[in-house]
């Protein structure tokens, strides 16, 4: 059920973002919904962690998501001021997205591995 809700929220946020202006409130809400729906999609793995661990993981996820969002908005403003080809800007932003998401996933994997419960119910 959480996978269905996560996928529905993901597509809904993409549709709202595509039809809203960049700095509008609906665009910001849709961006937040995007990250929340990704978290809901991965909620099936929550039984492997204690409540305190889930709080740490969720806070880390939202901080990293906010950091990636701010990094992308900063880079788009920076690239708009530089007079270079649109294709180069597009490739640089795609590279920035892939790199920052890969780093965020590595950080989340490291934190999740450290906080996972042992078979006896205690955390590592």
Curated annotation (Swiss-Prot):
The chain crosses the membrane at residues 54-74, 88-108. It comes from the Bacteria. Pfam families: YoqO. It is found in: Cell membrane. It is a multi-pass membrane protein. GO terms for cellular component: plasma membrane. Keywords: Cell membrane, Membrane, Transmembrane, Transmembrane helix. InterPro entries: YoqO. This is SPbeta prophage-derived uncharacterized protein YoqO. It comes from Bacillus subtilis (strain 168). The gene is yoqO.
